[in-house]
Design a protein with these regions (language model features):
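Conserved beta-strand termini and adjacent loop/short-helix elements that scaffold enzyme active sites
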Residues: 135-139, 216, 275
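Mid-domain catalytic core of redox enzymes
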Residues: 141-265
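A short alpha-helix-loop-beta-strand transition element characteristic
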Residues: 1-9
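Short FAD-binding loop at a beta-strand-to-alpha-helix junction that anchors the flavin cofactor
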Residues: 266-282
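A residue-level signal for conserved active-site and pocket-lining positions in enzyme catalytic cores
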Residues: 77, 126, 163, 213, ...
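Active-site/ligand-binding neighborhood in enzyme catalytic cores
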Residues: 4, 21-160
Length: 290
């Protein structure tokens, strides 16, 4: 099962924050008192969003919430999103709730894993079909045109279904304004030693300019590797320049209204469907799209 820790000072603590984390960061008697408050209030096994926890009228629960907010959410969120937790959708901050349990797993899915031969091979196999034609290095706007009452594909009226998964604002040349996204710069480093950090992912929630370090051999379970490779992730604001990738939609009310302008430009075409992170301006995990 996938587990993630956060580097907070000299400690590596499990995230999402759970009862194990609670006992690591508070002294024994205090931790036991706070654990009882959490289980009595929310029930063992519950998942409580940090912004909900901060609204509690109980001083002890607010003390936990303040610790989690300051040491796990605040700086990490500002790095990742360029905004404070209060400024983005609670759908985003709620993705990493406080767990009222002793489960250190980052995900709760019964089955977890990666494709045996990697995602590259998996998608090659998916696309290797006689009914699938792949066209590379082609802007959708070059082959897809919107007329008043129909869609043209390669200059001809097209009555079939069109499923669009790209950035919807760029499909319309950002005519209503560019939808804000966060992008990432991946800095790869290789070391001639068996291990760099002894685990797959370490989040840096109170320090560093990067958000996390991933050490791949702990995800792939490779044993016969020559050294170890890591990657550091540096978030930045997407501008649309060549080479930048719009990874994360910045979900708030203002951006949602802008997205709706673009969505309404497509709703007249009954055979046109928006699907995925970019086209729907949403934050999906890969399992939600299968």
């Amino acid at each position: 099962r996938h587990e993630v820790v956060a580097q907070v000072g000299e400690q590596l603590i499990p995230v999402p924050f759970n009862l194990n984390t609670l006992h690591m960061v508070f002294e024994k008697d205090k931790a036991e008192e706070l654990e009882k408050k959490l289980t009595d209030t929310y029930g063992y096994g519950s998942k409580v969003p940090i912004m909900e926890l901060r609204k509690s009228e109980d001083a002890g629960i607010r003390e936990i919430a303040d610790y989690v907010y300051q040491n796990i959410f605040l700086y990490y969120t500002m790095k990742q999103w360029g905004q404070k937790p209060e400024e983005i959708s609670e759908k985003v901050t709620g993705r990493v709730p406080v767990l009222i349990s002793r489960d250190n797993g980052y995900f709760t899915d019964r089955y977890q894993g990666v494709p045996k031969q990697g995602f590259h091979r998996m998608f090659r196999n998916l696309l290797d079909h006689p009914n699938i034609t792949i066209v590379l290095d082609t802007d959708a706007k070059e082959i897809l045109k919107f007329q008043e009452d129909e869609i043209l594909l390669h200059g001809e009226p097209f009555q079939g279904e069109v499923i669009y998964t790209g950035a919807v604002d760029e499909l319309f040349d950002c005519c209503d304004g560019r939808l804000p996204y966060r992008s990432l710069d991946f800095a790869f480093e290789h070391y001639d030693r068996d291990s760099y950090q002894g685990r797959s992912v370490v989040n840096y929630t109170v320090s560093e300019d990067f958000t996390r370090i991933t050490e791949f051999k702990y995800l792939t379970k490779q044993k016969d590797t020559d050294g170890t490779t890591i990657v550091k992730e540096y978030p930045f604001a997407y501008t649309g320049k060549d080479g930048e990738i719009p990874y994360y939609a910045i979900l708030n009310e203002e951006n949602r209204k802008l997205y709706e302008k673009y969505r309404k430009r497509t709703e007249h075409y009954k055979n046109f469907y928006l699907l995925g992170r970019l086209a729907e301006y949403q934050y999906y995990n890969i399992d939600a799209m299968t």
